[in-house]
């Protein structure tokens, strides 16, 4: 690692810092090639075809069966992956439909230049939401590189400072007027107004977090700016390498990635969505296996990168303190949201198993949000509930600090 890329040491060394990375797609998976057999439980299970690229790291990851968010909503399940809450039902939950990465971003605050990074390769990222229900905008491969390593010109920085000052002044006026308006509202309108004020406060907090980083230099790298459009495999590989650099330089501690597919890649003619509605056609199933195997190859590459790098802040490796998750909010192309495909690697969890939970249709079903809560607690976030959780996953443990 270049000296200029070494993260700044923390003043508080009492707890290790943690990171969270999620890889996803918007169309689910071909489940017959993804999940181990239902009775092939625990360590020593036979790794299925789609997960074969992860085999070298089998002691570093866990496969989960029968976890889901308890809904039957097809494509609308995609944005529910990291929250467990459907966006239009957010008002019924204390924290709305905030996603895990954004909850971590709130927890980390201004500890890093980017509280979170939401990125995409050939598919919009639909899984990241703030507590006010705002979907976090995503950036592409080139945008990711420039955000991490390209310094803004002095004039642009000066403009950004002035913009922050103006925005803060406007927010001050808004909050002052709000105090007057609120008194005359009905109870129903007061609830809506409270949501509006929460959004204003959220923006205020975001502005506060930006300011300290405007004058701090970005890390230097000898990596060249990647060229987009070289194909799904090359673009996705370049993106996970940038994600590893983002973790390595402590530029962020929360990243979500959504990956897709471009017609013509892997010698295939068609679209991911069309292939996902395979109707048991052998050629479509073969296409899905190729696309999804590539996602797992790049996840394996990310695991290897994190595993091979020393954690300059905590000691150990970056993988020891980075939870890497793969998941889909829609389980399969035919619109099922039952038994979501979920794999978790690293993060200090005890891995190496296929964990099977009660049938999602049974009265004893375990919410997928329990896994999300475990990830949050592992990260250091103090919470006993998250979204639709009923608790943590009791048998998914991690090494305590």
Residue ranges of predicted features:
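Ligand-binding pockets and gating/stacking loops
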Residues: 1-401
């Amino acid at each position: 690692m270049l000296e200029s890329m070494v993260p700044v040491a923390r003043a508080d060394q009492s707890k290790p810092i943690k990171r969270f990375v999620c890889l996803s797609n918007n169309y689910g998976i071909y489940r017959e090639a993804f999940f181990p057999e239902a009775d092939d439980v625990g360590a020593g299970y036979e790794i299925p075809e789609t997960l074969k690229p992860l085999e070298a790291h089998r002691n570093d990851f866990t496969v989960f069966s029968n976890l889901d968010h308890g809904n039957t909503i097809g494509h609308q399940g995609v944005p529910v992956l990291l929250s467990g809450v459907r966006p239009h039902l957010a008002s019924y939950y204390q924290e709305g439909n905030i996603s895990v990465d954004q909850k971590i971003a709130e927890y980390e605050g201004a500890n890093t230049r980017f509280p979170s990074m939401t990125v995409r390769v050939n598919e919009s990222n639909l899984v990241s939401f703030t507590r006010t229900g705002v979907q976090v905008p995503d950036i592409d491969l080139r945008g990711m590189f420039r955000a991490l390593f390209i310094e803004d010109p002095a004039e642009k920085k000066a403009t950004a400072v002035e913009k922050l000052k103006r925005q803060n002044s406007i927010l001050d006026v808004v909050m002052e007027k709000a105090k007057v308006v609120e008194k005359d509202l009905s109870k129903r309108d007061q609830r809506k107004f409270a949501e509006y004020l929460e959004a204003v406060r959220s923006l205020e907090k975001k502005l506060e977090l930006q300011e300290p980083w405007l004058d701090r230099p970005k890390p230097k790298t000898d990596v060249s700016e990647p060229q987009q459009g070289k194909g799904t495999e090359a673009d996705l590989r370049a993106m996970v390498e940038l994600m590893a650099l983002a973790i390595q330089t402590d530029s962020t501690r929360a990243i979500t990635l959504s990956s897709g597919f471009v017609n013509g890649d892997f010698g295939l003619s068609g679209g991911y969505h069309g292939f996902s509605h395979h109707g048991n056609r052998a050629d479509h199933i073969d296409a899905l296996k190729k696309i999804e195997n590539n996602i797992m190859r790049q996840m394996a590459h990310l695991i290897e990168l994190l595993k091979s790098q020393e954690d300059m802040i905590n000691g150990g490796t970056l993988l020891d303190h980075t939870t890497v998750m793969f998941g889909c909010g829609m389980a399969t192309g035919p619109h099922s949201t039952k038994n979501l495909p979920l794999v978790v690697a690293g993060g200090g969890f005890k891995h190496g198993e296929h964990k099977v939970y009660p049938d999602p249709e049974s009265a004893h079903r375990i919410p997928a949000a329990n896994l999300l809560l475990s990830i949050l607690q592992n990260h250091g976030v103090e919470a006993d509930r998250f979204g639709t959780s009923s608790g943590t996953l009791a048998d998914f443990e991690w090494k305590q600090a």
